[in-house]
Amino acid sequence: MVREIDCNELTELLELYLHLHENTVPDTTEILNNAWNTIVQDKNHHIIVNEVNGKIVSSCVCVIIPNLTRDVRPYAFIENVVTHKDYRGKGYATQCLNYAKEIAIKENCYKMMLLTGSKDDKTLSFYNHAGYNSADKTAFIQWLE
């Protein structure tokens, strides 16, 4: 079942992120709790999860960003697309991305964007099949310490 995350599911989400790029679940600190509270209280920040048999197996984040161009239409940014390694290839992440697209359409976004650090052909093909292309824009990243 695809849905938005409940505020009491932080631990499950952090455990899923171990299948993204994290090595450990962060300690519960005031900084973590403040960040989580900010996220769940932000009407433009959507953490989408796919639950199978009571377990969160896939997720993505969809942030709606207000904009002053394109007829003052917002755009959506997708981040942290992840599926538990034991559940990959079953369409769960695609369902999360489709849910994000529904949110973006409802919010009148004119585009959706995502970045991936992966160069793996399977990952790139996944995003292409989900409707994203890598031809229209060039992304630049500046990592901050």
Task: State where each predicted segment sits.
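Conserved acetyl-CoA-binding loop-helix of GNAT-fold acetyltransferases
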Residues: 80-83, 89-102, 129
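Conserved GNAT-fold acetyl-CoA-binding loop/helix
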Residues: 14-36
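Conserved beta-strand in the GNAT
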Residues: 49, 55-64, 82
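Conserved glycine-rich acetyl-CoA-binding loop
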Residues: 71, 84-95, 107, 119-124
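A short beta-loop-alpha structural element at the N-terminal edge
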Residues: 1-13
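Conserved GNAT acetyl-CoA-binding A-motif
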Residues: 97, 104-116
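Conserved beta-strand-loop-alpha-helix junction that forms the acyl-donor binding cleft
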Residues: 113-123, 141-145
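A short helix-loop-beta-strand connector motif used in the catalytic cores of GNAT acetyltransferases and
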Residues: 37-49, 77
